């Protein structure tokens, strides 16, 4: 059985190597940080695609600087593998309950997320 993350960045032509693997989660990151099961799943993806970088994308209620959390895992003596979580801010309120305002705020959050993701890759 083959396993695949949600996104692969820099996938080689033979599909055996990716510069980075990215996986989206639909549950918010809790105060404890990286979930153990999510970490194991990401490590499996990273080993499958011989990648040193893994990114877990989480929804985030608050637009703050804590949306980026890094944790490094050294699996081999000569190879530094890391997993980094990146929060995508989901607006929780809309001005006067207007859908258009939510869409505008969500577009800003998406643009900020894309910028932070590009900075990581």
Regions of interest found by a model, annotated:
Residues 1-121:
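Catalytic core segments in nucleotide and nucleic-acid processing enzymes
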């Amino acid at each position: 059985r083959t396993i695949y993350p949600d996104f692969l960045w820099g996938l080689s032509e033979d599909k055996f190597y990716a510069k980075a693997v990215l996986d989206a989660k639909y549950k918010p990151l809790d105060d404890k940080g990286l979930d153990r099961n999510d970490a194991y799943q990401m490590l499996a993806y990273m080993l499958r695609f011989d990648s040193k970088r893994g990114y877990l994308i989480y929804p985030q209620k608050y637009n703050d600087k804590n949306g980026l959390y890094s944790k490094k895992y050294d699996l081999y003596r000569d190879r530094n593998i890391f997993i980094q979580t990146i929060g995508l801010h989901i607006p929780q309120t809309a001005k006067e309950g207007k859908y258009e305002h939510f869409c505008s705020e969500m577009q800003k959050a998406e643009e900020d997320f894309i910028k932070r993701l590009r900075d990581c890759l």
